[in-house]
C-alpha cells in the first residue's frame, strides 16, 4: 500500500467550528482520511495480449528465465547474467495481487507476458478517465506524478463534510 501525505490548513478563526486535537503546545485540526477502498487487483485490469509496450530483447531474454517466487527481474538476471543486484525495479505484476503503484517511469511487467503495462491498464490502475486528454505527455508519466482523481475527489469530499460544512455561513 502506498501512503500519501496531504497538507491541510484552516484559518485560526475557524478552528472553533471543526474537529481539533490538542497537545501540550498547540491545538490543531483533525480530519479522517481513511478511505478503505477495495483494492484493485492486477487481474481485474489485465488485458492479455496487449503488446503496446513490449520488453526489449535483452529484458525479454531475462524475463524468459523467471521462476516462481521471483518478484522482479533481478533473480532471473542473476541466474542468466550473474548480476542479481540489477533490474530490481522491474517488478512483476501478479493477477491475484494488488496492482503496483504507478510511478512516472513505470517499469512493471505482467508475470505472464513480456511487456510493460499498457496505457489503458495504467488508467484503470490509477482511476483516470479513459477519455482524458494527456496532450503530448505520456500516460504513465502523468498518472505516476499525480494523485489519482478518485482519491482527490474523496479528499475534497472529506474536507467539505468534516470541516467546511461545519462553518457557519
Name what the model sees in each region.
Residues 7, 125, 144:
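Short, conserved catalytic/metal-binding motifs centered on acidic residues
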Residues 20-22, 166-169:
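Short, flexible loop/turn segments with low-complexity composition
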Residues 92-134:
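FAD-binding beta-loop-beta segment adjacent to the flavin cofactor pocket
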Residues 152:
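Acidic-aromatic/histidine active-site loop/patch
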Residues 156-167:
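Short, hydrophobic alpha-helical segments
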Amino acid at each position: 500500500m502506498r501512503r500519501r501525505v496531504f497538507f491541510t490548513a484552516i484559518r485560526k478563526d475557524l478552528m472553533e467550528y471543526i474537529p481539533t486535537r490538542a497537545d501540550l503546545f498547540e491545538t490543531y485540526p483533525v480530519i479522517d482520511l481513511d478511505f478503505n477502498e477495495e483494492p484493485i487487483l492486477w487481474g481485474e485490469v489485465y488485458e492479455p495480449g496487449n503488446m503496446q509496450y513490449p520488453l526489449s530483447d535483452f529484458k525479454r531474454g531475462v524475463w524468459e528465465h523467471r521462476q516462481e517466487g521471483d518478484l522482479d527481474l533481478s533473480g532471473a538476471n542473476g541466474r542468466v547474467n550473474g548480476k542479481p543486484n540489477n533490474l530490481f525495479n522491474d517488478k512483476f505484476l501478479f493477477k491475484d495481487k494488488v496492482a503496483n503503484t504507478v510511478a512516472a517511469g513505470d517499469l512493471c511487467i505482467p508475470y505472464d507476458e513480456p511487456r510493460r503495462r499498457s496505457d489503458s491498464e495504467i488508467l484503470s490502475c490509477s482511476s483516470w478517465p479513459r477519455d482524458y486528454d494527456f496532450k503530448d505527455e505520456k500516460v504513465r508519466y502523468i498518472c505516476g506524478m499525480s494523485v489519482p482523481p478518485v482519491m482527490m475527489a474523496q479528499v475534497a469530499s472529506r474536507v467539505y463534510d468534516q470541516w467546511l460544512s461545519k462553518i457557519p455561513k
